Design a protein with these regions (language model features):
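Ser/Thr-rich, low-complexity intrinsically disordered terminal regions
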Residues: 2-10, 19-172
Length: 172
């Protein structure tokens, strides 16, 4: 009986440590947990996907493409400038003719690598969009890390003077 109680105590400790690490991982990414589509949907997404991609009409406002008033070539230069300012980001390939680049983000503690593809896409009306796709190389759930990469690059673009407009969802 003592062995069973000790094993149950150990199991409880492992569960508590796991839940604490999970909470710290998600909270450490400073994600907008209470924003639409809500905490439950976000938690489920962060635990079960390792990809974050900007998509028109995304239920996650931070994952909607942003439009800019800069010409596409100037905006692509700002994207490269913004990435250069981000810690642990490295541009590994850049194609000026198509305004696309591939960057690798290396995590601080375990040195995990995430791939981020960024494109500046010209739009009718002259307001190019920045679209992104961030993918973890390891694991099934990224705890929102790739969403954080998208948010970090959009924030860095603001810092270098490229001010974007987020597509607004219509209220129905």
């Amino acid at each position: 009986m003592r062995i069973v109680l000790r094993l149950l105590g150990l199991l409880l400790l492992v569960v508590v440590v796991f839940v604490a690490m999970l909470a710290l991982g998600i909270r450490g990414n400073h994600l907008p947990m209470d924003d639409p589509p809500g905490s439950f949907v976000r938690l489920n997404t962060y635990l079960n996907t390792h990809v974050a991609e900007t998509i028109e009409g995304s239920p996650f406002p931070e994952l909607r493409p942003r439009s800019y008033t800069l010409p596409a070539d100037a905006l692509f230069a700002k994207v490269k400038e913004a990435i250069a300012r981000l810690p642990r980001w490295e541009i590994v390939e850049s194609k000026d003719d198509t305004r696309q680049l591939h960057a690798v983000v290396t995590s601080g503690l375990f040195r995990f690598k995430d791939d981020v593809t960024v494109s500046v896409v010209p739009q009718p009306g002259g307001k190019p969009q920045v679209t992104m796709r961030a993918v973890s190389r390891v694991g099934k759930g990224d705890l929102g890390t790739n969403t954080r990469h998208v948010m970090d690059l959009y924030d860095a673009l603001e810092q270098v003077g490229a001010h974007g407009e987020v597509e607004r969802m219509s209220s129905r």
